[in-house]
Structures are given as structure tokens and as C-alpha cells.
A protein has these predicted regions:
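Juxta-kinase regulatory segment immediately upstream of eukaryotic protein kinase catalytic domains
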Residues: 1-33
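ATP-binding glycine-rich loop module of kinase domains
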Residues: 32-84
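Conserved structural core of kinase catalytic domains
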Residues: 57, 65-68, 78-96, 100-146
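Catalytic-loop of the protein kinase fold
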Residues: 158-169
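Conserved protein-kinase catalytic-loop segment immediately C-terminal to the catalytic Asp
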Residues: 168-175, 181
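C-lobe/activation-segment region of protein kinase-like
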Residues: 175, 185-216
Length: 216
């Protein structure tokens, strides 16, 4: 006797996520400038515009850099507000187009944007600064190995004709596959400085943020 063949009903494709709608909803209620959410099977971040910043302190720092003849210390304004959001979205998209590891921008509007987490869902992505600090008990070779990885990650950006915003070790993150990624782009040094000075600024930021560990 021929028995009927019972098959499981076909599962249709998962509905596409409306990132723009999710962003619009969260910006209406989110209290913090940046917050993380689970959205389907991925983790995302919503970054909203903060209070605009004044220019007074940047003018003072600029005058000091000019007085001492140190153009590499010329301040790069972070104006906050919607301008900082637009700057970060533009910079993330530009660096991604250059093949560099940065968070993917999923949706954006004037007062905020949505980006994908640089790592596995529900897992923190450690910064290189955290890794270097944790390596101190293991000795100078372990610290130097991580420090050189950060330096090479910055060099990779420079070789692509770009620069970072604040190249502190805390803004270099270790992705699950071992690649060093880059975060925090609320300002654009290339808008106010020649590229060679931007590269020098990156080197100074990285050296400043890691000097305490190299001394040990």
C-alpha cells in the first residue's frame, strides 16, 4: 500500500528587518546617547545626537597650538548634536568603503543612526586598551605584541589614505575573528588638517593612551 508522503511545510524567508523604522522608534524613547539592542538574531547600537558643543575651548587650544608652533596639536572640533551624527555616519561609510573594519551603518536620520555591533550578539568586543592592560602581568613581550598590533591597525588606515578620529587604544577593538576594528568617529580631522598631520595626530593619540603600559 502506498502511504502518503508527509512533508514539513516550507518555511518562508524571514521577514526583512526595517532598520529605519526601528531607529525612528528608538530615538523617540531612548534616554542615553548610545544604547545596545537585540534585533532579530543580531545586536545593534542606536546612537542619538547629544547636546551641541560650543567652539570656545577649541579656539583656546588652537591659539596655544599656534603659539607653540605645534600644528599637529591643532584641535579638531567635535560640535556634537546633529553635526556629530552626520560626521560619524559619513566617516563610517567612507572607511567601510575603503575595506576597513568599522561598524556597519544600517539606518540614519538627522538626530541619530543605527549600526551593527562589531562582534557576536550578547558578547562584548574588548578594546585593545583593555587587552593591553590585562597583558601587563604576563610581561613586556605580551604587552609589546598587542601594542604592535594596534600600531599596524593604524598603519592600515593610513595606507588607505585615511585617518582615525581619536586613535586611542580604547577606540581600537578586537573582533571575534582577531581583526582589529575601529570605533568613535564624531569628528573629522581631515576637515581641518592636512593628511600628514592627521597621521601624526593618530600616532600621538595612540602613544599617549598606551604610554603607561609601555613604561611597565
Amino acid at each position: 500500500m502506498n502511504l502518503p508522503v508527509i512533508t514539513e511545510p516550507l518555511q518562508g524567508p524571514a521577514p526583512a528587518v526595517d532598520y529605519a523604522a526601528f531607529l525612528a522608534r528608538q530615538l523617540q524613547t531612548q534616554q542615553f546617547n548610545a544604547a545596545s539592542y537585540r534585533l532579530g538574531d543580531e545586536q545593534v547600537w542606536v546612537k542619538r545626537a547629544n547636546t551641541p558643543h560650543g567652539m570656545a575651548r577649541y579656539r583656546v587650544l588652537g591659539a596655544l597650538a599656534l603659539l607653540f608652533g605645534l600644528p599637529v596639536l591643532q584641535p579638531v572640533p567635535n560640535l556634537g548634536g546633529n553635526i556629530a551624527i552626520a560626521t560619524e555616519v559619513q566617516r563610517l561609510r567612507d572607511l567601510a568603503a575603503r575595506g576597513l573594519r568599522v561598524p556597519t551603518v544600517l539606518a540614519a536620520q538627522d538626530d541619530g543612526f543605527l549600526m551593527r555591533h562589531l562582534g557576536r550578539p550578547a558578547e562584548q568586543t574588548p578594546s585593545l586598551g583593555t587587552e593591553i592592560e590585562a597583558a601587563v602581568p604576563a610581561g613586556p613581550e605580551a604587552v609589546l605584541r598587542l601594542w604592535v598590533q594596534g600600531l599596524r591597525a593604524i598603519e592600515l588606515v593610513h595606507n588607505q589614505g585615511a585617518c582615525l578620529s581619536q586613535a586611542f587604544a580604547r577606540n581600537l577593538v578586537r573582533c571575534p575573528d582577531g581583526v582589529v576594528g575601529y570605533v568613535d568617529f564624531e569628528d573629522d580631522p581631515m576637515a581641518v588638517l592636512p593628511l600628514p598631520l592627521c597621521h601624526g595626530r593618530d600616532a600621538l593619540c595612540y602613544a599617549h593612551s598606551t604610554a603607561i603600559y609601555l613604561r611597565q
